[in-house]
UniProtKB/Swiss-Prot annotation:
Keyword Magnesium assigned: no
Membership in a protein family: Belongs to the immunoglobulin superfamily. SIGLEC (sialic acid binding Ig-like lectin) family.
Entry keyword DNA damage: no
Source species: Homo sapiens (Human)
Name of this chain's protein: Sialic acid-binding Ig-like lectin 5
Keywords, sorted A to Z: Cell adhesion, Disulfide bond, Glycoprotein, Immunoglobulin domain, Lectin, Membrane, Repeat, Signal, Transmembrane, Transmembrane helix
Motif (SLAM-like motif): 542-547
Position of sequence motif ITIM motif: 518-523
Free-text note on domains in this protein's UniProt record: Contains 1 copy of a cytoplasmic motif that is referred to as the immunoreceptor tyrosine-based inhibitor motif (ITIM). This motif is involved in modulation of cellular responses. The phosphorylated ITIM motif can bind the SH2 domain of several SH2-containing phosphatases.
Length: 551
């Protein structure tokens, strides 16, 4: 009796329900060729629970096709034929029992572009196509590029795994093929370059090179690739020192550099690495916590001194290690002459010559054009040479017969240059073995000739003044006419045991013995010229100048 009473109530509730067919799906979907796309979809249809429960089938069709005869693009009905071109690429992903009609489209092709509609069937009562809500699919050209993933930073000498993947791709459709190209790859194992994953052991020279991953779907003309530049971390492998843009030669982490004393020096230290190493210069060989003299790769010395000769070290510090190089700085100088000087001594003419240079120079004496080299002792000369540090000293003793005009020169040289000095001895001793007599006779002759010349000049001047006084009065200049007309030629500086100039003050007159040793290099007389009167009103007078000569 109770079921009969409830039956009208159930009928009343059923009569209030209205059959509803609804579909929620995107109206337009765009996908690149060869990629995948998921189209979310949900639907509803009128169904009463007291009906029988036949299976629920859903279908996706191309727009314009007749559902009863056309092949579907996707369905859950195993008895319906699916289009061969969409087989495996168009798939239903949702649970249709939960009214999920989501559609997965893989390996999209240009011919897939078009409109699609959804249909639901269940038993004899539910057969409905949702023509009002269609899906518009557009397939465009592939512009997506693969991604290259580095599982860890690239470090020189350490194996690193890489992977290549294409965003938006899926397993639907033919498989993807991969290929890797780049200078960092080993040509001995080509199989490793055909996988989506790659193990790479980079080298320092691989930094900055290109690595390319190319993807292609088998059986399709779809190809895409991406190229990346490798960023390889590596410690310094070599250090180069440049001077004026020219690299110095380095042997066994040591470089030798000669520098002229007083010259400016600028050195550049270069150590390629990634990231860049910290460069610094140290004096000598640096200890663990030594303080650098330069915190950059540049070392500047404004004026190189001999005290700076020695070692400098350039160090390149890097997180992966350090490297350093030793520079041996050698300060050199050209020969600098001190001398030569000559003097008469008991054993003969004694000449001395000194040179300073780095390295110490070699010395050579020349008598006229005849070289006198080394330490030797022969009949007419004796040479003695020595060196200490940058100094080289040599002495030359000449004895025996010497020519009247004697030229003695001293020359020094090292690998960087040479310098020489000479002494010209005029009217020297003709023969040291004959003693003082020849020298005295020669000196007396010179003094007699000088007195005659002075007397003749004095007579001519007195005669000229008398003629001027007779013609017109004039006042003579206070200057001594005789001293104004006599000039002495240049001569060499006297030797240490020789006297000073002949016109020395009376208080400094040299001893008689030294006066005997005096020799003139030359003596000349200039042409006499008449002097113009300075004061016309002065009375006519005659002036005499006293001439003093050493005896």
């Amino acid at each position: 009796m109770l079921p009969l009473l409830l039956l009208p109530l159930l009928w009343g509730g059923s009569l209030q329900e209205k059959p509803v067919y609804e579909l929620q799906v995107q109206k337009s979907v765009t996908v690149q060729e060869g990629l995948c796309v998921l189209v979310p979809c949900s639907f509803s249809y009128p169904w009463r629970s007291w009906y029988s429960s036949p299976p629920l089938y859903v279908y996706w069709f191309r727009d314009g096709e007749i559902p009863y005869y056309a092949e579907v693009v996707a369905t859950n009905n195993p008895d319906r034929r699916v289009k061969p071109e969409t087989q495996g690429r168009f798939r239903l992903l949702g649970d249709v029992q939960k009214k999920n009609c989501s559609l997965s489209i893989g390996d999209a092709r240009m011919e897939d572009t078009g409109s699609y509609f959804f249909r639901v069937e269940r038993g004899r009562d539910v057969k409905y196509s949702y023509q009002q809500n269609k899906l518009n699919l557009e397939v465009t050209a592939l512009i997506e590029k693969p991604d290259i993933h580095f599982l860890e930073p690239l470090e020189s000498g350490r194996p690193t795994r890489l992977s290549c993947s294409l965003p938006g791709s899926c397993e639907a459709g033919p498989p993807l093929t991969f290929s890797w190209t780049g200078n960092a790859l080993s040509p001995l194992d080509p199989e490793t370059t055909r996988s989506s994953e790659l193990t790479l052991t980079p080298r320092p020279e691989d930094h900055g090179t290109n690595l390319t991953c190319q993807m292609k779907r088998q059986g399709a003309q779809v190809t895409t690739e991406r190229t990346v530049q490798l960023n390889v971390s590596y410690a310094p492998q070599t250090i180069t020192i440049f001077r004026n843009g020219i690299a110095l030669e380095i042997l066994q982490n040591t470089s030798y550099l000669p520098v002229l004393e007083g010259q400016a020096l600028r050195l550049l230290c270069d150590a390629p690495s990634n990231p860049p190493a910290h460069l610094s210069w140290f004096q000598g060989s640096p200890a663990l916590n030594a303080t650098p003299i330069s915190n950059t790769g540049i070392l500047e010395l404004r004026r190189v001194r001999s005290a700076e000769e020695g070692g400098f070290t350039c160090r390149a510090q890097h997180p992966l290690g350090f490297l350093q190089i030793f520079l041996n700085l050698s300060v050199y100088s050209l020969p600098q002459l001190l001398g030569p000087s000559c003097s008469w001594e008991a054993e003969g003419l004694h000449c001395r010559c000194s040179f300073r240079a780095r390295p110490a120079p070699s010395l050579c004496w020349r008598l006229e054009e005849k070289p006198l080299e080394g330490n030797s002792s022969q009949g007419s000369f004796k040479v003695n040479s020595s060196s200490a540090g940058p100094w080289a000293n040599s002495s030359l003793i000449l004895h025996g017969g010497l020519s009247s005009d004697l030229k003695v020169s001293c020359k020094a040289w090292n690998i960087y240059g040479s310098q020489s000095g000479s002494v010209l001895l005029l009217q020297g001793r003709s023969n040291l073995g004959t003693g003082v007599v020849p020298a005295a006779l020669g000196g007396a002759g010179v003094m007699a000739l000088l007195c005659i010349c002075l007397c003749l000049i004095f007579f001519l001047i007195v005669k000229a003044r008398r003629k001027q006084a007779a013609g017109r009065p004039e006042k003579m200049d206070d200057e001594d006419p005789i001293m104004g007309t006599i000039t002495s030629g240049s001569r060499k500086k006297p030797w240490p045991d020789s006297p000073g100039d002949q016109a020395s003050p009376p208080g400094d007159a040299p001893p008689l013995e030294e006066q005997k040793e005096l020799h003139y290099a030359s003596l000349s007389f200039s042409e006499m010229k008449s002097r113009e009167p300075k004061d016309q009103e002065a009375p006519s007078t005659t002036e005499y100048s006293e001439i003093k000569t050493s005896k």
